[in-house]
UniProtKB/Swiss-Prot annotation:
GO cellular component term, pick one: endoplasmic reticulum membrane
Subcellular location, record wording: Endoplasmic reticulum membrane
Keywords, sorted A to Z: Endoplasmic reticulum, Hydrolase, Lipid degradation, Lipid metabolism, Membrane, Repeat, Transmembrane, Transmembrane helix
Enzyme Commission code(s) on record: 3.1.1.5
Entry membrane topology: Multi-pass membrane protein
Gene giving rise to this polypeptide: nte1
Protein name: Lysophospholipase nte1
Length: 1531
């Protein structure tokens, strides 16, 4: 061992082993094995050497022998077992028992000493604390920065589907048929036999280019099949000149719009151009074809008649002094050469006496009819004018026209009366929608339209009999006077209805009465002798001839009706019948000893007599008794002398007219819902038991007639309201007028003050557009003081008010007010609809009267207006096309889309029912600025430019009216904020959303997947719509209702046509229609719900899987462009964070937003049949109930029930959704102002307590924070708690001191500010908020404002609250966002764009010091500091550098604030918070109480002024339905 160099020599054994381990290891191993095999002591002796060696080396390997023999292998295995395994065991034992304890003893016996100073210890401590704080700061306290990225949801791209191929691309016969079918669509749906009857006599005619056609000589329905025809009208200034010269000259000249004579006088003017598939006839000319043989007025020769106009009398020009037309030469007025409609058709011409007709009481009819007829053939000057005079057609190219002659319409009227009545009803409806609505609401032709109603009173005035005047009327008035004294003035103005003892009985259905009558007839026939049956059959033959309500008791045996009618026999006697002493009337043999009821007053019920008499006059007025009464008198005496008055004779055609016309009697069969076949018309007109159908009608109407009293000044009908029914004036006067503004508007209109038009939903809207507010308040409403009425005419006793509107289901163009105390008989609209459906003569009479009273101006407008029907997705015109017409939406919805230079589609606007589009381009003769396409199947009125030019020359007032409309639209465009016109992504959705929320008429409710309770959802939504007061009401449709209406046509092509017309009528009748898709996904009704909807609500269960459902796939396959919104149903008022994003992530087609609705529902439908209760089933159900109860208490979910809620039902989720669909949402806009925004919490609480619902919330800066708190839960209590907690954090100086950093970008890092907002909102997203919410920010990277309505709440609220210099901007998709108040601190414009109707704007911003500065042209900073501290200085302090920067930043915000204050519908609120600073968060309670007190005072002030938009005012409007539910007098 050499120790000098520190090297220790190893033992020989170890040294040799280390030198040659390969030879030493096997030897030592074999020696150890042999020693172990011989004796244990030898193993103990060599323990120390082996342990030292084995502790450093692993177990030695064993080299296997050469595989020569099997014995060698076996030996090697035994050697391995006895050598290696013991060595390993020995190593483990020695290490754990000796080596390891030795190491531990050595370690613990060692001592270490560290010596360091305080500086080192301090540095080490700081390092440790810094490491821990860094770990906590960046690992635990910044969880907001590690949230998964959730970018804002992008607006879906607009899809324009390819155009529907035009029909003119089809070859040959298909093109011809398509053009013809498109032209006769104006008739509505036609059944196959009706279609064949109409077209079997159709003729075609070829016109060469330049050939003219006098339409006034064409007696038929003309349509263009192929070619182009121009329609000309003779100028009014040149009407009296001859027309032959004009026609000859016009045929050879070019197609200018105006032709001029050499002397400068005008000739013919171009009205319109008719292309393929369009009609050359107007709606009025079609009506004239159907009503040639209909009388204008029922003949009443008694003294009580209000007019002497009879069916055989001509109406001269002096009969209608206000008529714009000459009535004496109109074929529809002149009745002298027509036969009485009641003449029997079975009689032949030879049976008739060859005598000319006599006219009793008038001499205005020319005596020579044949001479007049002959002269008409040869003299153009003396020929009778048609319904379309001075109308000439000229073919521009070789044209093929089709003509359906007038004889086809006459035969159709005779063979298919119910189909004729339906066609007339369809045309009357379209006449109102197309011609009347356009002339009244769009062109301002009030005098022409309202003059028709005024002149109509000439036909409908019939006085009550004299016996009901005097003392009888006085006794009736006494009953009302007693009740009026008992009631208050407010109740009396709604009307007092006389008690009707039979009014409460529910009338039985017509089918039930028919079955009952048939059964009773069989029973009577089986019991009576043959002679009685023969007598009844003879009577039945007489009744088949015709029945008049005035002759009921003279032809009907009362005993057949049972004891009740025998008891009521005196009361059923018609007073009008008794007072007519006609020599043709004989006493009825059925009622022996009948005497006049007026001589036995003690046995009469005068109320019933009044009702019978009023009903008699009303039925005469609507034309139900004219032909039938005369016909009954004639047929009752076949052997007697026939009065010439009762039998007219046509000397030209040598045959009797109306000999067996279907309208000569009243059709007995009610138009059932399943559409009964017209073949049933050939059956007997009487019921099976011999009962005339008119008796059933009289019984029904007698129960429906109400006698109502209205005091002076009461409003019976309001402008824009659908007529509640017919008012027959018994005593008093009704004043018919229109509301006019006292202050005339200029060309661009005058905007009302902000408080004038606060809540448009509280006022009825005009039928032309939902944006034009009507007046629906009571006469004493303080908000109507700015309007006055202009009286048009008076309705005197005996007159009928509402005839045109009630029979044809029009809306009223006028107000009807009681001029004096008035007593009226009221027949509800439902009864009139029943009459019109069962008795076609009422509609035909109305159509006849309308055609006779039509002004020439309306005729020309009706001729030129084209009724157009387009399919869903069809493009009406493209961008860049020539503007040739103005389009008015009658039904459906249109969307205007502008294509930018980069191909991006931008929605310009959407247009609903009653709105127009294209005036500006037509007036300026420019090209179309955008593409217009139909969102769904749409009906349009096409107003050609040629008609506008023609009207502008002859009626300048029309030009002024349209100019006002265009000027108003231009004003709206000028006043629209520039931000809303831009194409930036953050602002582009404003205009689109605003246009799409207005004037929605149809809403489709579609489930996401099967099992969603859409029926219950639709019913609750409908109930909410009724409660908020939708204009004209709302209704819902499901498959059951549609099948009930269609009946046997439900699954045929006819059913589709019938359904389309039915749906169009419903949309016209109601303000909103809900289509509930309650069928399977592939059913036709589901497809109908999608195609008919302006807006589609996709309803899904929030707790179910958010995958795409089968109904959504079907919706996407339909390629509809309607607006789509998602509705999530929650069982509780709670939405888990991120749930809404999962639903919206895969639904890029949702372009209308989403809604959260709480609704309790059953996941499984109740079984229709109760299941048998077995023991196993009962036990299983009981276990499930117990398990559910346990989970209720053990679940960790916190039940989100509102802790505070105002006592108002209008804050419900369904009411919020209903207001959104109606465009009546209430918005709340909160401005920025730092700690001053705490006052907004108090204002919101005041709004809650006042019961004002809030639907949409928008905020800026601190307003975004407060608004997000309220929108999250829609509750005041959690908002108050979280806001106070956040204010406590912001009031801590130490938190900001610890967050300070080097002011390169800002003074603080923003971490503490981020944590304060994140601790308030967590990971919730804006989509999960219960109320719709948005906040605005300023994008300094792109220099624009952005509005955020999706994404993490804390990020965008933090960005909206980021003051420049204090907090760094927040990064969002590469852009830097700062406080939104720099551009717009009060976002009223954006809220208005979202569809909010009433907006509460709370401004808490600071007010700048506007003191004039006079410090000169230069300024010393030292002088400014001294002046600031000098109390004796008179110079104002100049602003500091920071104040100048702040004012510079808020320059644009001040302009937007001033515009927001003047926005219509905006209620501007500014609490007195000026003494408080931006960072005074420590004064939370003080500022909160100040805002609460201000809010209560402000709302109370609005309530006193009548300007508070409370839903209760809508309920008051419902009470104006005066006669629908009148107050009964206790008599």
């Amino acid at each position: 061992m050499a120790t000098g160099d520190g090297i220790i020599a190893a033992p020989p054994s170890l040294e040799s082993s280390s030198l040659d381990p390969l030879h030493v290891l096997p030897a030592s191993s074999s020696t150890a094995a042999r020693s172990l095999a011989t004796s244990i002591p030898a193993l103990t002796a060599s323990f120390s050497v082996v342990s030292g060696f084995s502790s450093h080396l692993p177990p030695p390997p064993v080299t296997p022998p050469a595989p020569s023999t099997m014995v060698g292998w076996i030996g090697w295995i035994f050697s391995f077992i006895f050598q290696v395994i013991p060595s390993v065991l020995y190593w483990i034992v020695t290490f754990t028992t000796i080596t390891l304890p030795t190491w531990l003893f050595t370690l613990f016996s060692m001592s270490l000493t560290f010596t360091m100073n305080f500086t080192t210890l301090l540095l080490i401590a700081l390092a440790v604390v810094s490491t821990i704080s860094w770990f906590i700061r960046y690992r635990f306290l910044n969880m907001y920065s590690r949230l998964p990225p959730e970018p804002q949801r992008k607006e879906p791209q607009l899809d324009l589907f390819p155009d529907v191929p035009d029909s003119d691309t089809k070859p040959g016969l298909a093109n011809y048929l398509d053009e013809f079918l498109s032209a006769i669509k104006v008739f509505g749906y036609l059944e196959r036999p009706v279609f064949h009857e109409l077209t079997r006599t159709m003729q075609t005619r070829k016109l060469i280019a330049g050939e003219t056609l006098l339409l006034e000589e064409e007696k038929g329905f003309c349509l263009v099949v192929d070619g182009l025809v121009q329609i000309f009208v003779k100028s009014m200034r040149d009407r009296k000149s001859g027309s032959d010269e004009e026609l000859n000259r016009m045929a050879g000249e070019s197609s200018d719009e105006d032709d001029h004579r050499p002397d400068g006088r005008q000739g013919y003017q171009l009205l319109t151009e008719v292309k393929n598939g369009a009609s050359m006839s107007s709606l009025f000319s079609i009506l004239s074809l159907f009503t040639e043989d209909v009388q204008l007025r029922y003949a009443d020769s008694s003294a009580s008649s209000a007019s002497s106009i009879g069916p055989g009398l001509a109406i001269g020009p002096d009969s209608f002094p206000a008529s714009p037309r000459e009535m004496d030469d109109s074929p529809h007025v002149y009745q002298g050469d027509r036969l009485d409609p009641a003449s029997h058709r079975n009689s032949t011409a030879e049976d008739l006496p060859a005598v000319p007709p006599l006219n009793l009481g008038e001499s205005q009819v020319p005596p020579a009819h044949s001479a007049r007829s002959e002269s008409r053939k040869y003299s153009g000057k003396t020929r009778r004018k048609s319904v379309h005079p001075d109308i000439v057609a000229r073919a521009m190219v070789d044209t093929t026209i089709a003509i359906i002659p007038a004889s086809a319409f006459r035969r159709l009227t005779r063979v298919y009366p119910k189909a004729t009545a339906h066609i007339v009803q369809v045309i009357l409806t379209r006449l109102q929608r197309v011609t009347f609505a356009t002339a009244h609401s769009y062109l301002g032709l009030n005098n022409e339209v309202l003059g028709i109603e005024k002149q109509m009173t000439k036909f409908t005035t019939y006085d009550l009999p004299n016996e009901l005047r005097g003392s009888a009327l006085d006794r009736l008035k006494d009953k009302f006077i007693k009740e009026r004294d008992r009631l208050g003035q407010e109740e009396v103005t709604k009307g007092i209805a006389l008690h009707n003892p039979y009014g409460g009985r529910r009338p039985r259905s017509s089918s039930f009465r028919r079955k009952e009558a048939a059964l009773q007839a069989k029973m009577v026939a089986s019991k009576r002798p043959v002679s009685m049956v023969a007598q009844d059959s003879a009577l039945s033959d007489r009744e088949n001839s015709g029945v008049s309500p005035g002759d009921l008791l003279s032809t009907i045996q009362l005993s057949r009706f049972g004891p009740r009618y025998e008891h009521l026999a005196p009361r059923l006697l018609s007073p009008l019948t008794e007072k007519e002493h006609s020599p043709l009337r004989s006493p009825s043999p059925m009622i022996p000893g009948r005497a006049s009821p007026f001589h036995r007053k003690e046995s009469l019920d005068e109320d019933a007599l009044f009702r019978e008499s009023i009903l008699e006059c009303i039925m005469k007025g609507i034309g139900l008794t004219g032909s039938t009464n005369d016909f009954l008198r004639k047929s009752s005496h076949p052997s007697g002398d026939v009065s010439p008055k009762l039998l007219s004779y046509d000397s030209r055609r040598q045959k009797a007219v109306f000999s067996n016309n279907a309208f000569g009697f009243i059709d007995p069969y009610e138009g059932s819902a399943d559409g009964e076949s017209e073949s049933m018309m050939s059956m007997s007109v009487t019921s099976a038991g011999g009962t005339s159908p008119i008796v059933n009608l009289r019984e029904e109407l007698r129960n429906d007639i109400e006698i109502v009293y209205f005091p002076q000044g009461s409003v019976l009908v309001e402008q824009g309201e659908r007529h509640p029914g017919l008012y027959y004036v018994v005593d008093g006067f009704l004043d018919v007028g229109i509301p006019v503004d006292d202050k005339e508007e200029d060309l661009v209109g005058s905007s009302r003050p902000a408080h004038e038009e606060l809540f448009p939903m509280l006022r009825r809207t005009n039928t032309s557009s939902s944006r034009v507010s009507g007046s629906a308040a009571a006469a004493n409403d303080p908000r109507r003081k700015k309007q006055s009425r202009r009286s048009l005419y008076l309705i005197k006793p005996g007159g009928i008010q509402g005839y045109v509107g009630a029979v044809a289901s029009y809306r009223s163009y006028t107000d009807v007010v009681a001029k004096t105390d008035v007593y009226v008989g009221f027949l509800p609209r439902a009864s009139l609809e029943r009459i019109a459906e069962r008795y076609p003569l009422a509609l035909l009479t109305l159509a006849k009267r309308l055609t006779s009273l039509l002004p020439r101006l309306l005729l020309h407008i009706d001729f030129a207006l084209e009724w157009v029907q387009v399919s869903a997705g069809q493009v009406i015109y493209h961008q860049g096309d020539e503007s040739d017409a103005i389009y008015l939406a009658l039904n459906g919805r249109l969307r205007s889309v502008h294509e930018g230079p980069n191909g991006k589609m931008t929605v310009v606007g959407e247009y609903g029912q009653g709105e127009s589009v294209g005036e500006l381009e037509v007036m300026t003769e420019s090209t179309r600025p955008a593409t217009l396409h139909a969102i769904r199947d749409t009906e349009l009125a096409k107003f050609p430019r040629t008609l506008f030019n023609s009207l502008a020359q002859e009626h300048p007032g029309i030009t002024i009216q349209v100019s006002k409309l265009i000027a108003q639209r231009m004003r709206d465009l000028v006043e629209t904020p520039l931000a809303e016109k831009g194409g930036e992504p953050g602002v582009s959705g404003t205009v689109k959303t605003a246009k799409s929320t207005l004037n929605l008429r149809t809403v489709g409710i579609l489930p996401v997947t099967a099992g969603v309770p859409v029926v219950e959802f639709g019913n609750r939504l409908l109930q909410a719509l009724h409660q908020i007061g939708v204009t004209n009401g709302a209704t819902s449709l499901n498959q059951a209702a549609i099948l009930n209406h269609l009946g046997r046509h439900a699954f045929s092509k006819m059913g589709k046509l019938k359904l389309s017309q039915y749906l169009a009528d419903l949309e016209e009748k109601y303000g909103m229609v809900l289509y509930i898709a309650d069928t399977s996904v592939n059913s036709p009704w589901t497809q109908t719900c999608i195609t008919q909807a302006d807006c589609i609500l996709l309803v899904g269960l929030a707790e179910s899987t958010p995958s795409i459902g089968e109904y959504e796939r079907f919706l996407l396959g339909m390629k509809t462009t309607a607006r789509k919104e998602l509705v999530l149903l929650h069982g509780e008022r709670y939405c888990p964070p991120g749930l809404t994003r999962q639903w919206l992530k895969n639904r890029v087609w949702i372009n209308g937003g989403h809604h959260h609705v709480q609704m309790a529902f059953r996941l499984t439908a109740e079984p229709s049949h109760p299941q048998t209760k077995r023991f196993g089933t009962v036990l299983k159900q009981r276990v499930q109930v117990i398990q559910a109860e346990i989970q209720k208490y053990t679940s960790r979910r916190i039940r989100q029930s509102p802790l505070y809620s105002a006592q108002t039902p209008f804050k419900g989720d369904f009411h919020r959704l209903a207001r959104r669909l109606c465009g009546r949402s209430v918005g709340l806009v909160l401005g920025g102002g730092g700690a001053r925004g705490i006052a907004q919490v108090g204002v919101i609480k005041a709004l809650e307590e006042a019961g004002i619902p809030i639907d949409v919330i928008g905020g800026t800066s601190i307003g975004s924070f407060i608004g997000a708190l309220y929108a999250r839960d829609a509750d005041v209590v959690p908002m108050y708690g979280r806001a106070k907690k956040f204010a406590g954090r912001m009031g801590s100086i130490w938190r900001f001191a610890l967050d300070l950093t080097y002011p390169t970008v800002s003074y603080t890092t923003g971490h503490e500010f981020n944590r304060g907002i994140f601790k308030t909102f967590g990971d919730s997203q804006i989509e999960d908020f219960w109320l719709e919410f948005y906040c605005n920010t300023t994008n300094i990277s792109r220099s624009r404002a952005e509005y955020h309505s999706s994404g993490y709440t804390w990020r965008y609220v933090r960005a909206s609250m980021s003051l420049a210099g204090l907090i760094p901007p927040i990064c969002d998709e590469g852009s830097m966002l700062l406080d939104g108040g720099y551009i717009d601190n009060l976002t009223v414009d954006h809220m208005k764009g979202l569809g909010a109707d009433v907006i509460f704007a709370v401004d808490v911003g600071s007010i700048d010091d506007n003191t004039p500065q006079v410090y000169g042209d230069s300024l010393s900073g030292f002088w400014a500091v001294v002046n600031r501290w000098n109390p004796f200085s008179s110079c104002p302090n100049p602003p500091t550098l920071s104040e100048i920067q702040a004012r510079l930043a808020y320059v644009s915000s001040i302009e937007n604030l001033e515009r927001a204050k003047n926005t219509p519908g905006c209620l501007y609120m500014r609490p007195p918070i000026d003494p408080y600073g931006t960072l005074d968060f420590a004064k939370f309670d003080e500022i909160y109480q100040l805002g609460y007190a201000y809010g209560k005072n402000y709302l109370e002030k609005l309530k006193r002024e009548g300007s508070l938009p409370l839903p209760e005012e809508t309920e008051e409007k419902k009470k104006l339905q005066r006669t629908l539910a009148p107050r009964r007098a206790s008599i």
